[in-house]
Amino acid sequence: MNKIIQFVLILAVGLVLYFLLNRMMQKLMVELSEILYKEVNPEKYLQVLNGWKGKMFFSKKTRSLMAIDALLMQNETAKIEEIFEQLDAVKMNPGNKLGLAQKEVSFYIDTKQFDKALKAYDTLKEIAAKFNNPQVESILKECTFLVEIYIHHNTEILDELLDLAGKMSNPFYQGIFLYRAAKLYYFKQDEENCRKLLEEAKEKLQGTAWEVMIRQMLEENPALVAER
């Protein structure tokens, strides 16, 4: 009887610890999201992510993957490429591999490494084909937009792109999509709407390296949008 009681007590304590730790992890993820996307504070985000709480709940590979968005805001291209090389060389579950390919498509397009972008896009399509859920389809669609905008300059998707940007709740990503729509207006030789969307994107991207870049375009030459 004593052994049964001990087993029940150990099981009960284990369950309490499991739910407590799970709640702490969820709370940390909410905290990190608010720091990065509401406060737009990538430096603080990385400090918390790589602090004791981040190390407690996330593996080194996961933390590297989670760091990419913050490093994008800081325009730390060398660090991002280093992370991509490290993560491409290790085994990851399909979900993380999908997230990595998504970030690679975006990054390599932004840095005009189009061969690498198309390679990552092919990888993304292969992984996405193994899933059957709306979230994965949304990720694939977003990356298809990037390929069509930056590599093929396809202005036919402009209305769809603007509709997607309007539905986004995250100001950082909304700003990025508005900026990309501005590019398409430039490719259509519509400078008025190009400038208008650059202004809107700048407001959404306050406090980031993107804001500085867009401000320079508006002050010097909106045609720079075609190159960046």
Describe the predicted segments one by one:
Residues 1-29:
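N-terminal signal-anchor transmembrane alpha helix of single-pass membrane proteins
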Residues 31-32, 67, 104, 144, ...:
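Structural register within alpha-helical repeat arrays
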Residues 35-36, 71, 108, 148, ...:
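Residue at a conserved register position within TPR or TPR-like alpha-solenoid repeats
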Residues 39, 74, 111, 148-152, ...:
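Structural motif corresponding to the intra-repeat A-B loop/turn of tetratricopeptide repeats
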Residues 43-52, 77-89, 113-129, 153-168, ...:
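Alpha-helical repeat scaffolds
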Residues 44-75:
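Acidic, Ser/Thr-rich low-complexity segments on the non-lumenal side of membrane proteins
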Residues 57-61, 92-98, 128-137, 169-175, ...:
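Boundary/linker segments of alpha-helical solenoid repeat arrays
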Residues 141-228:
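Extracytoplasmic/periplasmic C-terminal soluble domains
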